[in-house]
From Swiss-Prot:
<feature type="region of interest" description="IgE-binding. Binds to IgE in 5 out of 7 patients tested">
    <location>
        <begin position="92"/>
        <end position="104"/>
    </location>
</feature>
<comment type="pathway">
    <text>Glycan metabolism; pectin degradation; 2-dehydro-3-deoxy-D-gluconate from pectin: step 2/5.</text>
</comment>
<feature type="region of interest" description="IgE-binding. Binds to IgE in 3 out of 7 patients tested">
    <location>
        <begin position="317"/>
        <end position="327"/>
    </location>
</feature>
<feature type="signal peptide">
    <location>
        <begin position="1"/>
        <end position="21"/>
    </location>
</feature>
<keyword id="KW-0020">Allergen</keyword>
<feature type="region of interest" description="IgE-binding. Binds to IgE in 5 out of 7 patients tested">
    <location>
        <begin position="251"/>
        <end position="258"/>
    </location>
</feature>
<feature type="binding site">
    <location>
        <position position="170"/>
    </location>
    <ligand>
        <name>Ca(2+)</name>
    </ligand>
</feature>
<feature type="region of interest" description="IgE-binding. Binds to IgE in 6 out of 7 patients tested">
    <location>
        <begin position="239"/>
        <end position="250"/>
    </location>
</feature>
<dbReference type="Pfam" id="PF00544">
    <property type="entry name" value="Pectate_lyase_4"/>
</dbReference>
<keyword id="KW-0456">Lyase</keyword>
<dbReference type="GO" id="GO:0045490">
    <property type="term" value="P:pectin catabolic process"/>
</dbReference>
<feature type="disulfide bond">
    <location>
        <begin position="28"/>
        <end position="45"/>
    </location>
</feature>
<comment type="similarity">
    <text>Belongs to the polysaccharide lyase 1 family. Amb a subfamily.</text>
</comment>
<dbReference type="InterPro" id="IPR045032">
    <property type="entry name" value="PEL"/>
</dbReference>
<feature type="glycosylation site" description="N-linked (GlcNAc...) asparagine">
    <location>
        <position position="148"/>
    </location>
</feature>
<feature type="region of interest" description="Beta-helix">
    <location>
        <begin position="38"/>
        <end position="305"/>
    </location>
</feature>
<feature type="glycosylation site" description="N-linked (GlcNAc...) asparagine">
    <location>
        <position position="178"/>
    </location>
</feature>
Length: 367
C-alpha cells in the first residue's frame, strides 16, 4: 500500500499536471482523431449559460473559398455571403485565409463559423464581427486581430432584413447586441481598436471559453451602460480562457447581470483583472491569478462608480477555490452562501485554481 506521503505527492502532481489534461469542452471532441468527419458534434460540447447554442447544427455545410468582400452584394464563396444567409449553415474554410472586411460582418442566426483545419485570420486593419438580435451563433478557431473602426455605410445585415445604413463601429473584434445563445470558443484575439468582446443590450445565454486574449488593453465588456436595465437578466459564463500576456483590464468588466468566471488563467494585468459597476453578480471560481510586480496592482477586483466602499458592500462578488500568485488578492462582498446557478444541461465541473494553467494550455485557435 502506498504511504500517505506518496499519496499526497501524487494528488498534488495530479492537480497541477496530468489529471486535468483536458477541460470538459475539449474532452468532448478533441480526443476523436476523426473530428473533421463529424464537425457538428462540436455543438454538443458547450457548457455554462451558452450550452444550448446549436449554431448551424442540422444545416448544410458552406465552404468559404474566397477572401473577397462585398458588403452590399456578397458573392457565393465569400464569408459574408454564408454569414448572412437566412438558413442554418456550418461555415468552414477551403484553405488558410487572411480576410480583411470592408465593413462589419453581420452574422445571422443559426450559424457556426468553424476555422478548424485551416489558419483563418480576420481583421487585418478592417472592421470585424457583429451580431444583432440573433441567436444560436458559434465562433470557433479564428484569429481575430487588428480590427479597426468603420465608417457610416450600407451593409447587408441578412437575407430577410436586407441592406441597411450602418453607423460607424468602434473597432471591436466581436460585438453582440441583444444576442441569445452564443458560444465563443478557441479563438485568439488581440490588438483591436476598442474591445475584444462586447456583450450588451440585453444579450444573455453566452459562453466565452478556451480563448486566448493578449496584447490588448480593454478585453471584455459585459453590459451596455449603467442605465440599461435590460442587462439585469444577462447571464455569461467565462471559462478556460488564457488572459495575457499584455492584457490590461476588463477580464471581464460587467454591468448588471450574472457572470461566472471559472478555471481561467490570468497573467499579470496592467490595471485590474475583474471589474464591474451597477451591482453585477460575479462568481469567481477555480481561477489562477498572477499579480503584477507593482504593489498597488495586486488586487484582482475593481468596483467602479462606488462613492464609498459601503456603497458596494452588498454586491455579490465571491471567490471560491481561486489560486493567488505573487500577492494577488480578491476582495469579496455581499452574501457568500453557495447558489445553484446552472440547470443540469449547463452545469460543468470546475477544478481548483491550481489546475487552471493546465486546463487552459490549449486556449486559443486549434487547427
Amino acid at each position: 500500500m502506498a504511504s500517505p506521503c506518496l499519496i499526497a505527492v501524487l494528488v498534488f502532481l495530479c492537480a497541477i499536471v496530468s489529471c486535468y489534461s483536458d477541460n470538459p469542452i475539449d474532452s468532448c471532441w478533441r480526443g476523436d482523431s476523426n473530428w473533421d468527419q463529424n464537425r457538428m458534434k462540436l455543438a454538443d460540447c458547450a457548457v455554462g449559460f451558452g450550452s444550448s447554442t446549436m449554431g448551424g447544427k442540422g444545416g448544410d455545410f458552406y465552404t468559404v473559398t474566397s477572401t473577397d468582400d462585398n458588403p452590399v452584394n456578397p458573392t457565393p464563396g465569400t464569408l459574408r455571403y454564408g454569414a448572412t444567409r437566412e438558413k442554418a449553415l456550418w461555415i468552414i474554410f477551403s484553405q488558410n485565409m487572411n480576410i480583411k472586411l470592408k465593413m462589419p460582418l453581420y452574422v445571422a442566426g443559426h450559424k457556426t463559423i468553424d476555422g478548424r483545419g485551416a489558419d483563418v485570420h480576420l481583421g487585418n486593419g478592417g472592421p470585424c464581427l457583429f451580431m444583432r438580435k440573433v441567436s444560436h451563433v458559434i465562433l470557433h478557431s479564428l484569429h481575430i486581430h487588428g480590427c479597426n473602426t468603420s465608417v457610416l455605410g450600407d451593409v447587408l445585415v441578412s437575407e430577410s432584413i436586407g441592406v441597411e445604413p450602418v453607423h460607424a463601429q468602434d473597432g471591436d473584434a466581436i460585438t453582440m447586441r441583444n444576442v441569445t445563445n452564443a458560444w465563443i470558443d478557441h479563438n485568439s484575439l488581440s490588438d483591436c481598436s476598442d474591445g475584444l468582446i462586447d456583450v450588451t443590450l440585453g444579450s444573455t445565454g453566452i459562453t466565452i471559453s478556451n480563448n486566448h486574449f493578449f496584447n490588448h488593453h480593454k478585453v471584455m465588456l459585459l453590459g451596455h451602460d449603467d442605465t440599461y436595465d435590460d442587462d439585469k437578466s444577462m447571464k455569461v459564463t467565462v471559462a478556460f480562457n488564457q488572459f495575457g500576456p499584455n492584457a490590461g483590464q476588463r477580464m471581464p468588466r460587467a454591468r448588471y447581470g450574472l457572470v461566472h468566471v471559472a478555471n481561467n488563467n490570468y497573467d499579470p494585468w496592467n490595471i485590474y483583472a475583474i471589474g464591474g459597476s451597477s451591482n453585477p453578480t460575479i462568481l469567481s471560481e477555480g481561477n489562477s491569478f498572477t499579480a503584477p510586480s507593482e504593489s498597488y496592482k495586486k488586487e484582482v477586483t475593481k468596483r467602479i462608480g462606488c462613492e464609498s466602499p459601503s456603497a458596494c458592500a452588498n454586491w455579490v462578488w465571491r471567490s471560491t477555490r481561486d489560486a493567488f500568485i505573487n500577492g494577488a488578492y480578491f476582495v469579496s462582498s455581499g452574501k457568500t452562501e453557495e447558489t445553484n446557478i446552472y440547470n443540469s444541461n449547463e452545469a460543468f465541473k470546475v477544478e481548483n485554481g491550481n489546475a487552471a494553467p493546465q486546463l487552459t494550455k490549449n486556449a486559443g485557435v486549434v487547427t
